[in-house]
Regions:
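Long, contiguous N-terminal structural blocks used for assembly/anchoring
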Residues: 1-80, 88
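Short, well-structured alpha-helical patches and their helix-loop capping segments
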Residues: 2, 81, 85, 104, ...
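Short coil turns that connect the paired helices of HEAT/ARM alpha-solenoid repeats
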Residues: 44-48, 79-84, 118-126, 151-158
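Eukaryotic acidic, Ser/Thr-rich intrinsically disordered low-complexity regions
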Residues: 2-3, 8-11, 142-172
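Amphipathic alpha-helical elements of HEAT/ARM-like alpha-solenoid repeat scaffolds that form extended
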Residues: 16-30, 49-63, 84-99, 125-136, ...
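Extracytoplasmic electrostatic interaction patches
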Residues: 107, 132-135, 150-154
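Generic secondary-structure transition motif, activating predominantly at the C-termini of alpha-helices
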Residues: 21, 35, 47, 113-120, ...
C-alpha cells in the first residue's frame, strides 16, 4: 500500500511540474510550501523529470529560500544518501553552474562534517568518501585537493587518513 502511495506521489509531482511550467506564481507557491525533507524525497525519486525540475528552479534564482533548500538537499543527499540518492544528486548538481554551486558547497560541506558527530568511524568514513566523490565527479579539483590535504590528511580517525593515501595513490 505504501509503495502505491509513493508512485501516485511521483505521478502527481510530475503532473504538477507540467501544469506549473508556465505559471511561475503557482510553481513558486508549490515549492515554497515544501520542507527540506520533501525536497530530499522529491529529488531522490528516479521517475521524476529531474532536469525539468532543475530548469524550473533556475526561474527562481532570486527566491533564495527555495534555492537554499534545493542546494542543501542535493548536497546533503550526495554526501549522506543511499547509493541511488548519491548518483541522482550528483547528476543534478552537474547541471548547476559552478559559480552558483561553489559558495554553497563551501558553506554546506563543513556543516555536514560537523553534523556527523557519531562515534561510528565507518559512518564518518562513508560520508568523507562521498564528499571526495562529489568533488571529483563535479570536476572541482581545487576543492577536492583542499579537502584531501586539509581535512583527511591529518584526521584522528585512521580510516579517514587512509582516504588521503587512497586518493593520492589513485591520482598518480
Amino acid at each position: 500500500m505504501e509503495e502505491k502511495k509513493v508512485i501516485n506521489n511521483i505521478y502527481e509531482i510530475n503532473s504538477i511540474l507540467t501544469k506549473f511550467q508556465n505559471d511561475k506564481k503557482k510553481y513558486f507557491y508549490f515549492l515554497e510550501r515544501m520542507d527540506e525533507k520533501e525536497f530530499f524525497s522529491l529529488l531522490s525519486k528516479r521517475k521524476i523529470d529531474s532536469l525539468r525540475f532543475v530548469n524550473l528552479l533556475f526561474l527562481f534564482a532570486n527566491y533564495t529560500l527555495i534555492i537554499e533548500k534545493f542546494y542543501y538537499s542535493l548536497i546533503y543527499l550526495a554526501t549522506v544518501g543511499t547509493e541511488s540518492e548519491v548518483i541522482n544528486s550528483i547528476y543534478l548538481l552537474k547541471n548547476i553552474p559552478y559559480e552558483w554551486l561553489r559558495d554553497k558547497l563551501k558553506e554546506v560541506i563543513p556543516e555536514i562534517v560537523e553534523l556527523i558527530r557519531s562515534e561510528d568511524e565507518e559512518e564518518k568514513h562513508y560520508v568523507y568518501n562521498k564528499i571526495l566523490s562529489l568533488y571529483y565527479f563535479l570536476g572541482y579539483k581545487e576543492e577536492l585537493d583542499d579537502f584531501i590535504n586539509n581535512i583527511c590528511k591529518g584526521h584522528q580517525i585512521e580510516l579517514i587518513r587512509e582516504l588521503y593515501d587512497d586518493w593520492k595513490d589513485w591520482k598518480k
